[in-house]
């Protein structure tokens, strides 16, 4: 084998390895996500909701990898979401005193927010509101 062939083989194998790693990072959260709550479970938990809001995909901060579409309800015991989220690792749910549309808004307001909990599913979720959160 010539040096040129060896270099091409090494380069193509490295490209395939990097591509496999990137695809694995994207797919792993989808494969390891727990089952999402059913629509009836979400409806039961959201029956005492005090507030309702929506996630829209057309916000300034949304892109192919960061979006959500659906209805959020906020109650004393649960915050529920019926809809879909972009797959991704380590989603956290925060309550903010102001509207947040972009990552810059989030970073600016993060110190004033209350972290409620982790979101582990990409379709429908229910998160317990911790004691002491009003």
Each language-model region and where it sits:
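N-terminal Lys/Arg-rich, disordered targeting/topogenic segments
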Residues: 1-6
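An anionic, turn-rich surface loop/hairpin at beta-sheet edges
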Residues: 102-132
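Hydrophobic membrane-insertion alpha-helices, especially the h-region
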Residues: 7-26
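Solvent-exposed coil/turn segments that connect beta secondary-structure elements
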Residues: 84, 96-99, 132
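Short coil-to-beta strand junction motifs in C2/discoidin
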Residues: 86-89
């Amino acid at each position: 084998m010539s040096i040129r062939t060896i270099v091409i083989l090494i380069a193509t194998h490295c490209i395939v390895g990097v591509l496999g790693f990137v695809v694995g990072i994207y797919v792993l959260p989808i494969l390891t996500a727990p089952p999402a709550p059913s629509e009836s479970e979400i409806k039961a938990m959201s029956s005492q909701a005090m507030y309702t809001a929506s996630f829209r995909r057309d916000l300034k901060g949304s892109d192919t990898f960061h979006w959500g579409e659906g209805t959020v309800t906020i109650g004393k015991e649960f915050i529920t979401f019926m809809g879909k989220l972009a797959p991704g690792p380590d989603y956290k749910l925060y309550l903010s005193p102001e509207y947040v549309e972009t990552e810059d808004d989030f970073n600016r307001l993060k110190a004033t927010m209350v972290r409620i909990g982790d979101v582990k599913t990409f379709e429908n979720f229910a998160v317990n509101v911790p004691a002491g959160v009003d």
